[in-house]
């Protein structure tokens, strides 16, 4: 690596979790990309591989996908805000996701996190399923 990339890497290592989160948001805004989309793809692969065995019924599912099925038209802005808060998406990406329902909001998350997200979105007028 070059000296410049080494220096950047060392700076990143010293960031707190909050600072790293803020940095990700700034990078998403500056470059028009979404870290959540690529993380969702990466996280979906292990879940798909685990589901391939299919023989053991006794094993409890540990990864869940939160699917926005629909929403009340009057609550669209509230649902949009809840989706943005949960995913970290920009306004345009979150709006496209909400308007394209049924669509996955988050994939490969824990049961507790999935149920909390479902409750949050249903409280503002969205209809959500867990898969």
Curated annotation (Swiss-Prot):
UniProt lineage: Bacteria, Bacillati, Cyanobacteriota, Cyanophyceae, Synechococcales
Domain of life: Bacteria
Encoding gene (name): rplL
PANTHER family: 39S RIBOSOMAL PROTEIN L12 (PTHR45987), LARGE RIBOSOMAL SUBUNIT PROTEIN BL12M (PTHR45987:SF4)
Subunit (UniProt): Homodimer. Part of the ribosomal stalk of the 50S ribosomal subunit. Forms a multimeric L10(L12)X complex, where L10 forms an elongated spine to which 2 to 4 L12 dimers bind in a sequential fashion. Binds GTP-bound translation factors.
Classification via Pfam families: Ribosomal_L12 (PF00542), Ribosomal_L12_N (PF16320)
Protein task: Forms part of the ribosomal stalk which helps the ribosome interact with GTP-bound translation factors. Is thus essential for accurate translation.
Species: Parasynechococcus marenigrum (strain WH8102)
GO BP terms in the entry: translation
Sorted UniProt keywords: Ribonucleoprotein, Ribosomal protein
SUPFAM superfamilies: ClpS-like, Ribosomal protein L7/12, oligomerisation (N-terminal) domain
Record protein name field: Large ribosomal subunit protein bL12
Signal sequence, renumbered to the chain: none
Family: Belongs to the bacterial ribosomal protein bL12 family.
GO cellular component term, pick one: cytosolic large ribosomal subunit
GO molecular function, one term: mRNA binding
């Amino acid at each position: 690596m070059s000296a410049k990339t080494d220096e950047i890497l060392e700076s990143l290592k010293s960031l707190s979790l909050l600072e790293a989160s803020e940095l990700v948001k700034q990078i998403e805004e500056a470059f028009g990309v979404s870290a959540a989309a690529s993380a969702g793809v990466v996280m979906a692969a292990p879940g798909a591989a685990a589901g391939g065995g299919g023989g053991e019924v006794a094993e409890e599912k540990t990864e869940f996908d939160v699917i926005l099925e629909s929403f009340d038209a009057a609550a669209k802005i509230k649902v949009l805000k809840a989706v943005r808060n949960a995913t970290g998406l920009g306004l345009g990406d979150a709006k496209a996701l909400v308007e394209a329902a049924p669509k996955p909001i988050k994939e490969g998350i824990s049961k507790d996190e999935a149920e909390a997200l479902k409750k949050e979105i249903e409280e503002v007028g969205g209809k959500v399923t867990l898969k």
